[in-house]
A protein has these predicted regions:
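Non-heme Fe(II)/2-oxoglutarate
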Residues: 50-138, 159, 238-239, 246-267
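Short beta-strand His + acidic residue motifs that chelate non-heme Fe in jelly-roll/DSBH
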Residues: 160-163, 228-235
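Acidic, proline-/serine-/threonine-rich low-complexity intrinsically disordered repeat tracts
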Residues: 14-35, 40-54
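Short linear clamp-binding motif
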Residues: 3-12
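Catalytic core of non-heme Fe(II) oxygenases with the double-stranded beta-helix
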Residues: 152-221, 251-260
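Active-site region of the double-stranded beta-helix
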Residues: 117-147, 155-169, 176-180
Length: 267
């Protein structure tokens, strides 16, 4: 007799065996890729995470990608460019040793250029894209405000070393005058590798650097702690860009997740 079967006997002595009782399994929670909400502890579905099918049912995920937003400026800015060209800059900056002199690009004496009325339209454009970055990419209701902003001018042969932007959350660069065939900015991967394998083809997983081509009038926004540099200008025309930093307006964080930062108490 099968295990867990029930023996029924009728009055005639004939035996009837009921089928085994099936054990009901509790429903298994459906697993899904998501992110943990630090406030509630709940796992929320990840929105827009990049995936790729690898064949045989294998799926490749790109966790924690770095957001870099490129925004075109579609209005005429000839007046703003003329003002920018005439803006005073610091003297030529040199580095390296006697046998290997490096000529760095020059920065404007004014480190709050976006406060100037001559650049009011450019500032409005940048602020609108900052709001988009915060709302649609960072999914936050907070507001980022522009702190410092300055011009960078590079003659032929001038460059800028690798760096990050401290005391800033999102940084940006607007390019009013560049040569579109020469990428004006290079990013370095946050995933530094101690062991290097031979590489047949570079991709987002094995590349250490990424040179980003830009067009005149385009704006780029990126996390301020993302290491970047500026390759040497190889053209006769001066390369000009406008850089800026940002910081959240008002208090930051959340009390429940123990990340609350009352900036009004720090004054």
């Amino acid at each position: 007799m099968p295990v867990n079967a029930i023996d029924f006997s009728d009055l005639t002595g004939n035996k009837q065996v009921a089928p085994p009782v099936q054990q009901q399994q509790p429903p298994q929670p459906q697993q899904q890729l998501g992110v943990k909400n630090p406030k509630t502890g709940e796992v929320q579905p990840a929105m827009g995470y990049p995936t790729a099918q690898m064949g045989q049912g294998d799926e490749l995920l790109q966790l924690f990608p770095t957001p870099v937003l490129i925004c075109p400026y579609l209005l005429d800015y000839s007046k703003e460019l003329e003002w920018i060209k005439n803006a005073d800059c610091r003297k030529e900056n040199k580095g390296g040793d006697a046998g290997n002199v490096i000529h760095y690009n020059r920065q404007s004496n004014d480190t709050f250029v976006l406060d100037r009325p001559e650049l009011a339209n450019i500032r409005a454009f940048i602020e609108s894209r900052l709001a988009k970055f915060v709302k649609e990419i960072m999914a936050s209701d907070d507001q980022l405000v522009i702190t410092q902003s300055w011009l960078n001018k590079a003659k032929k042969g001038e460059s800028h070393h690798e760096h990050v932007h401290p005391n800033s959350m999102v940084s940006g660069v607007w390019y009013p005058q560049i040569h579109e065939q020469l990428p004006p900015i290079q990013f370095r991967s946050r995933n530094q590798r101690d062991i290097s394998l031979s590489t047949k083809q570079y991709n987002t997983f094995n590349s250490a650097t990424f040179m980003l081509p830009m067009k005149r009038g385009e704006l780029i926004l990126f996390p301020s702690n993302l290491t970047h540099s500026v390759p040497a200008n190889q053209m006769e025309e001066e390369r000009i860009s406008l850089s800026f930093n940002t910081w959240p307006k008002g208090n930051m964080g959340d009390e429940r997740s123990l990340t609350y930062l009352p900036l009004d108490r720090c004054v």
